[in-house]
Amino acid sequence: MAPDSTFVLLDGSRQTTADMKGRVTLVNFWATSCAPCIAEMPRLIATHNRYKAQGFDTMAVAMRYDPPSYVVNYSETRKLPFQVAIDNTGSLAQAWGDVERTPTAYLVNKRGEIVKSYVGEPDFFALHQLIEKLLADTPS
């Protein structure tokens, strides 16, 4: 299962892992100072836009060492279409498996179970196939 977590979004609102149930969600830990994170961002945006109408979400979690002003600036100038949270205490990274390397991502199914984790940029073709499979799954 995905850890019980509360994500504080850039607008100050909160979302929990319980709120994600019923949707397939990619939880992506990243930083504005991480070149591979920035390099994969266009593909994350394209993936989000491709599947969002079918019940897919992306939660981008900025690491605690990433200055919030940088995260806000990047998110606004790039018009990120998904939710962005700031892990200002590092507690989210710790709860999700002591995340230290970025990018690190977790694909969570409709039941709230982590079905795949990625360290580094994922194989987007394989990721898309898995997302489609999970979206087609009816949770019991």
Where are these regions (language model features)?
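Thiol/disulfide oxidoreductase modules built on the thioredoxin-like
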Residues: 73-81, 86-135
